[in-house]
Amino acid sequence: TEIADGNNIPYPNINGFGTGTDWQKKLFTQAPITNYTFSASGGSETITHSTSGSIFKQEGIISPEKSNFNRITLRNNLGIDLTDKLKLSTFLLYTNINRKTIPEGGRGSVLYYGLNASPLTPIFDGTDGSGPSRGYSYIGSEQGIEIINPFALINNTYNETKVNRFTGKVELSYEVIEDLKITSRYNFNYADVANRNYNPLAYYGPNKVNNSVNVDDNNQFIRDTNGNGIIDLFSGVGEDTQNYTDYTWETFIDYKKSFDNHNLSFLLGTSIRSEQFYGVYGYGSLVGEDSWSNAYLFNTQDIYDEYILTSLDPDGNIVVDNKTVQRNRSASTGVNEDRWFSLFGRVQYDYDGKYLFSAMVRRDASTRFGPNNRTGYFPSVSGGWILTKEDFFDVDQINNLKVRGSWGITGNDKIGSYGWIGRLQGANAEATYPFGNVLSYGNALGQLANPDLQWETNEQINFGFDASFFNNQFDVTMDYYVKTTRNLLLVPEVSGLLGSTAGGSAAPIVNAGTIENRGLDLSINYKKQLSEDFRLATGLNITTVKNKTLEVNNAAGFIPSGQFGLGQTTSRFQTGLPIGSFYGLQTDGIFQNQAEIDAHASQSGAQPGDIRFVDGDGDGVVEFGSEDDLAVLGNPIPDMTLGFNLNLDYKGLDFATSLYASIGNDAVRSYERFLTYSNKSRLYLDRWTGEGTSNTTPRASTNASNNYLFSDFFVEDASFLRIQNVQLGYSIPSSTLEKIKMDKVRIYVAANNLYTFTKYSGYNPDVSNANPSAAGVDLGQYPQTRTYTLGINVSF
């Protein structure tokens, strides 16, 4: 790269680096998963009960000691017939979770640094670990201010979450008279969550944004001039306790009546739901031993440090700068409460089991919207006709044929609390104000309010049929659907330059527009007893979808999203396009020589080996910031998804496998850093090195280049076929088990996520995102794990 730009060779003796560091190979490891379950049940004519439990342990595939998940569950079900008409049922589940985490995905994660760190840098620096480096090599500033040694980050990461959760249900049903029943059901969930995190004194190299300490020219900690110790810029301890309580109380009346061949049922009900949250947060600077075992709030204090920092000005003169660090312990609380009130009714009718009709309406009120928009009405109707019950239908090969259709509207309010009202937030770095020479904590504006927020609605029309053939061995189900989402709830990714993300704020939630999905769902299943000992069952599911944005509720007609490089976006929610469509520059190969550059439309800064961009509007100039030269580059929504399963049983042996395929979805490589000495994708091994060497991958360069503008060069076909599961089991014959008083013993081996066939160069072609307008943008997504399981099921 340096030679290509006319510079000196940076590493004359590259053999001195040995084999280098394969960061990804060093980071990933095999991790065990263990799962133990038990269950017991019993009862009498009036009482039934069951108890079950499980112990689950899983270690992370990166740094198992810092990334793991442990869960214990206990479950109990109880049913009692109090009288002939009054019945009681209860359910109680206790869950205990202990989880440790590292930064797992996206920018700032261990994996992101592992993908981009130079292979010329070793993991360790050869020191005893007592100095600022803690024994880990520095990643040079030439690799950017944010790229750090991923193993150093792991060493300095301490996050622990402990959860105790109780989930339960109590239900009473009473048969008032024949055909009339009243049911009242109370569901509850309570969770107590305790988080503790620790940011130790850490130095990752010159000018790194993650540094919590500074060092002098001798690579030693800079200390307080008053003798107070090492200057701590922002390390510390955070602890918080969060309580979640939610309940739902439903009461409904159900009336059923049959006369002649008519069957009627009516249901009327009401539902009250509440979700409450209360959190207490604290943060402070640790004193005493700098360790995880000492990292508790009671070991923190306010700090005030003074130190001298020397540096060189552009002329080489020494500049002495007196610095002060003052940080007080902070505490804050958070309170959320959401409430819902619903009324609903349903009527169902069928005649002789042949003609089916159902209608339902809900009225839902939610405090997640302002007073003028809290209530939504959501009706639905459906109908069906079972032709095989008609006297005129007499086809031996067709055992069941039902045609059906439905229309309905549902509502969505999953946007969090208080999006419609402005709030203040405090006790954070953004909410500090200077009074004289002292910085004081206060409050700052939180997420911007949108008082006009309203329900997102999903209107769906379905037409389909269900059919069974050849003595019910062959089943086919097909649906054609049109789903229209109006007032789509979305948080736009707004640039901080616009001010909405400054000072601790965030972009408001908006009703962004209208999208439409239409497609086909097809399910085909076949089962057959091939012989007395051999049984086969297989199935195929196919789903197609065409997504289109019908309306965007702003003047521009689009909302940008997705992260790429520095300040660039990848995707758009734009009228006429699928949601999350990738939008950028189109490419037309690589400039092979100066003559090609001269013959092409004017492209600023172009050199042989650079990407040749398409002049979209044909005006003779490729304008990098112009709408006219941008185009649709793909979208993350698959044209088709397929699922396949196969089950075989032969005597005591059983075999099962399932496959999943996604066809037509694209993804963006947005996990690369375009810096001189950072790691590069393997595709750069086939880069342009001279005329005729490559027409797909540009030259390597240390200088600023337009090759790193977002274009279709970074968009890949992410279609894939995944072997999701393969399992082989053996059940010991019952004749053998009778001798040892057992009902069933099955031993099995299984593999999950066995292999993925794909051309995508990232870890996982199935790139997800909570924001649908930024789906398919791979920021360094954590890979799916492959698991191998050996298990045994025992029943007494």
Per-segment meaning from a language model:
Residues 2-18, 109-148, 201-228, 278-329, ...:
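Surface-exposed loop/turn segments flanking beta-strands in extracellular/periplasmic regions
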Residues 25-102, 113, 166-169:
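Transmembrane beta-barrel wall of Gram-negative outer-membrane proteins
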Residues 1-66, 153-155, 173-175, 324, ...:
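Residues embedded in well-ordered regular secondary structure
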Residues 29-48, 54, 150-197, 236-259, ...:
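Outer-membrane beta-barrel transmembrane strands
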Residues 45-46, 85, 179, 258-264, ...:
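Short loop/turn motifs that connect adjacent beta-strands in outer-membrane beta-barrel proteins
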Residues 61-71, 81, 93-95, 101-106, ...:
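Small-side-chain secondary-structure face that scaffolds active or pore-lining regions
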Residues 1-14, 104, 277-289, 510, ...:
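Conserved small-residue
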Residues 11, 151, 205-207, 214-219, ...:
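Extracytoplasmic gating/loop element in the C-terminal half of outer-membrane beta-barrel translocons
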